[in-house]
């Protein structure tokens, strides 16, 4: 009986071995950099990228949309020259979670390190962050970052050796813009921000001067701030028309038209002709550079994590601009406008500095009511990624087109960011909201509004957001004191098919504004039918044109506001030549 059992056991074991599937060799990558590009140990986010084509480098094909390629990220501390770092399944990936799940095939591979510096904050905390290097906080174009040239590889089940990737290239410095007759550039060291960050920190701006600035030395000018993402130079203004034979074969996927580069160039020249025309009102237009270690923009408010950018802009930068370029320097003569991030900023600075501005024009603003943080109610929902349901698991969308077709979900958006950086360091949209709005955590980094992997919302952080940055809530809470200072100053615009669902928060803001009394808000909320991001109030022209005309489209309303509200004796004539 024992011998029979032994024979059966051996036979069963042989059978098991025969049917066992062939083990898969997991692809792995060893990434390094030579001493020639950096002689010191490096801290940062190491990002491995793979693409199935070579139309562009993999670092330029990575995003959260349906056309994204593959990315995997991991933190490195003290990575030494020549040291090979193994990038395997411990790296966080999107849209494929693990390197071992990459399908067999041919790929182009590239690695890059977004290098961190150590900051000793005023709060006493020490953090490691990627400083802006003049590029506007972009990991894939940041000067000083090391990267490798792409090369072709094959991933298959018989791989036995790791693929070696050497980051032997360095992204070069950004060229500073030069002054012209009409566009000037200014940079100051901010005392407030330097104290906060523990090292010299600067604010910059591009200033568009009015026609006749030099020939009217006694004139002083109203000022308009055009808020938005990081401007490398003053955009949309050109003293030269585009060449008549300019290539128009370029295709804009966003707007579905060919030749958009020429359209933009023509609009820039048209703006110059209008700006310098006879009897055109003379203003200063300012675009601010306030990139920081968390994003290309500070949101122009004070923040526990980013610093007192609101006060630094208001009380350090603007006075210097108005001193150098003869601004009137009074609240009745300042206006602010912008779209998307710039729309939120325009409304926020008007609210937080109500006497210092005489009107805001906020187009497609980032969420201005956190009951609609896109499609998340941070006060009631339990999870940012999934709708609350006992049995059904339905993902929350984060991006759509004008027909409502979903192109990304909340989970995808945030997992994409998590590849680029932990601890709110991706330099992307959801992380900057967290960096601006959240309290500082015990480790010196922003407290998470929700778990970046699972989506679970932290209600205590949500309450902090509410009291400090929920613009609708703050207006409603403080209308008794704010209302008299904001009457007639609030103008909000949004497409009703905004790609990021920003119209939902605008609906909620409008519902409150309609109820205001003592005083009634006396402003404007308007919507573009079937209009996507970022509709700005133009019912006549298509979005691809109106988005290029911010610096002129609100002028009639601004001039009317000045006529109605300028104090007695104010200078409303010297700049009308």
Please report, for each region that a protein language model flagged, where it lies by residue.
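N-terminal processing/targeting junctions
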Residues: 12-15, 28, 214-216, 315
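Non-catalytic cap/lid and distal C-terminal segments of serine-dependent acyl enzymes
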Residues: 52-92, 97-577
């Amino acid at each position: 009986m024992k011998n029979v059992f032994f024979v059966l056991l051996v036979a069963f074991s042989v059978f098991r071995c025969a049917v066992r599937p062939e083990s898969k060799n997991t692809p792995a990558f060893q990434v390094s950099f030579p001493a020639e590009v950096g002689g010191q140990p490096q801290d940062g986010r190491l990002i491995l990228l793979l693409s199935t084509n070579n139309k562009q480098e993999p670092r330029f094909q990575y995003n959260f949309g349906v056309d994204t390629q593959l990315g995997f990220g991991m933190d490195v501390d003290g990575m030494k020259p020549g040291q090979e770092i193994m990038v395997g399944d411990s790296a966080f990936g999107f849209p494929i979670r693990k390197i071992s799940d990459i399908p067999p095939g041919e790929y182009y591979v590239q690695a890059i390190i977004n290098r961190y510096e150590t900051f000793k904050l005023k709060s006493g905390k020490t953090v490691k962050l990627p400083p802006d290097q003049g590029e506007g906080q972009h990991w894939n174009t940041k000067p000083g970052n090391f990267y490798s040239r792409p090369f072709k590889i094959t991933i298959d089940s018989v791989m036995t050796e790791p693929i070696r990737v050497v980051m032997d290239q360095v992204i070069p410095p950004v060229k500073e813009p030069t002054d012209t007759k009409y566009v000037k550039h200014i940079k100051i060291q901010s005392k407030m921000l330097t104290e906060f960050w523990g090292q010299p920190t600067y604010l910059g701006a591009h200033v568009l001067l009015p026609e006749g600035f030099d020939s009217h030395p006694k004139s002083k000018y109203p000022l308009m701030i055009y808020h938005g993402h990081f401007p490398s130079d003053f955009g949309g203004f050109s003293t030269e028309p585009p060449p008549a034979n300019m290539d128009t074969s370029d295709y804009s996927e966003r707007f579905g038209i060919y030749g958009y580069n020429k359209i933009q160039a023509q609009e820039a020249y048209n703006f110059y002709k209008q700006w310098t025309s006879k009897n055109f009102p003379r203003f200063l237009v300012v675009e601010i550079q306030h990139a920081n270690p968390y994003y290309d923009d500070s949101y122009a408010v004070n923040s526990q994590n980013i610093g007192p950018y609101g006060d630094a802009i208001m009380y350090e930068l603007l006075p210097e601009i108005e001193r150098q370029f003869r601004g009137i320097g009074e609240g009745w003569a300042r206006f602010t406008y912008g779209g998307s991030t710039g729309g939120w900023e325009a409304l926020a600075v008007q609210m937080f500095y109500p006497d210092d501005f005489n009107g805001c024009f906020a187009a497609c603003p980032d969420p201005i009511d956190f009951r609609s943080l896109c499609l998340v109610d941070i006060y009631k929902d339990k999870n940012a990624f999934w709708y609350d349901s006992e049995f059904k698991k339905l993902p929350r969308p984060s991006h759509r087109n004008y027909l409502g077709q979903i192109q990304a979900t909340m989970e995808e958006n945030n997992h994409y960011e998590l590849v680029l950086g932990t601890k709110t360091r991706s330099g992307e949209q959801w992380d900057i909201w967290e960096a601006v709005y959240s309290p500082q955590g015990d480790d010196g980094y922003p407290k998470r509004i929700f778990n970046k992997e699972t989506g679970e919302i932290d209600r205590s952080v949500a309450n902090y957001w509410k009291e400090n940055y929920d613009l609708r809530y703050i207006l409603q809470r403080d209308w008794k004191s704010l209302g008299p200072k904001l009457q007639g100053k609030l103008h909000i615009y949004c497409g009703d098919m905004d790609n990021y669902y920003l119209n939902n928060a605008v609906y909620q803001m409008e519902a409150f504004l309609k109820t205001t009394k003592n005083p009634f808000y006396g402003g404007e909320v308007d919507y573009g039918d079937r209009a996507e991001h970022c509709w700005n109030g133009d019912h006549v022209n298509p979005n691809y044109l109106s988005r290029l005309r911010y610096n002129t489209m609100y002028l009639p309303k601004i001039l009317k506001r000045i006529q109605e509200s300028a104090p007695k004796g104010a200078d409303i004539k010297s700049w009308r030549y």
